[in-house]
Amino acid sequence: MLLYGLDTDTSFSRALATELGVGLAPFENRHFEDGEHKLRPLSDPRGQDAYVLHSLYGGSSESPHDKLCQLLMFMATLREHGCARVSAVVPYLAYARKDRQTKPFDPVTLRYIAQLFEAVGIAQIFVLEAHNVAAFQNAFRCPTFHIEAHSAFEAMVSEGLIEQAVAVASPDPGGVKRAQLWRESLVLTLGRPVGFAMVDKRRSAGLVSSDNLVAGDVNGMTVLLLDDLIASGDTMRRAAVALRGAGARQVLAFAAHGLFVGSAAEVLCDESIGQVIITDSVSPFRLPTDHALRKRLRVVSAAPLFAQALRASHAAWRR
């Protein structure tokens, strides 16, 4: 197995390599004065099973487009030089939210991204908590592996909320299935009933309204509010306010990907949110180190989940 980590922030790739018990394969990323890049492996990839890791969020120095282009060109280079199988490991998949047309002449960008991956000859792709699982799986014609973020959160919840009445909630109708899957898993883990709720949300012309409508009983419960990502934080805050208004004892906000754009740090410091828990799929570089939210933020590693998936994939390939 060859594991390449293209991210400038190497913390996730190093954690994944440690979980797998392998070293990161060496490569060169040469920057030219005109802004172009050249990426090449520094060891012979012929006949190897290669996994290329790149989380496609916009960083402090690289846009999602920069990262996407580098990832595609490097995977194509591996195929060019005889790599037996190349797999994309993409904890955060850019443009996954644009999976359908909502206005006249809209793009379906997720499908175009999938076509780019297929054009360079990848064998399969691993993604953490896609915005819409069905749309993600249907966009790609190669095998897809969807890793559910709630598996990373489960140990924390089972240890910290042993005696408390718990409910899982979705902040909008679109995330109901995601929240239901976690609820079903928690029932087995905790060995007792777990409540369920959903907060209404409607979006029109970029404006969001919810009217604080909550479906489900959360009175006196600790609510685990689960979404795929946190961008501006408005969806989480609106839902948390509605849940507290419906009698929730406390609301803990969980998301696979913490983008924290704009004034998200201030929004999420609302008293309705007790704690914010994310995975390490995206580095929380946008949060100032001395911001109050840092004290309420917990980052859980998704590396063990990816290691399990990659290990199984490699073992099957070797057979």
Annotate each PLM feature.
Residues 1-319:
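PRPP-associated nucleotide enzymes
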